[in-house]
Amino acid sequence: LHLVALNLPFSGDVRADFQCFQQAQLAGLKSTYRAFLSSHLQDLATVVRKTDRYHIPIVNLKGEKLFDNWESIFNGKGGQFNIHVPIYSFDGRNVMTDPSWPLKVIWHGSTANGIRLVSNYCEAWRTADTGAMGQASPLNTGKLLDQKVYGCSNQFIILCIENSFVSDPQG
């Protein structure tokens, strides 16, 4: 399952699922992508289909492994990953080094176990007000789910996850 960033940073009022869907389509990717965010309807840990959570590695756009599987992100250790494996945007840029993302932080709105934090998810990702708060993770921690709180006006990285495995029919 691919973990890919949106092509630009966003504040807390992001229509992230739509953006993930649209940018994946424009990049020619065939499967469905959902935002790596907890929402008012769903905890982040349940975004990927149950049948695909345990045996499929999580990889970047180029197929390099970030996690053994989806469940391993939510083991309570904050989604520890190898910072030497880049996370790419849908247009192929490395979010860790590209200046288009001046703040190397990802929004997630979740606990370390991938459960929604209703007080810290920018009012279900509908506001960019400075007074509203969102849970996010600085990537230099080497974690996707580090527990830091930021104002929703910040423009951070939004990740998208391929939410079900589709094998290549030409494979």
Locate each region found by the language model.
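Secreted/extracellular ectodomain signature
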Residues: 1-171
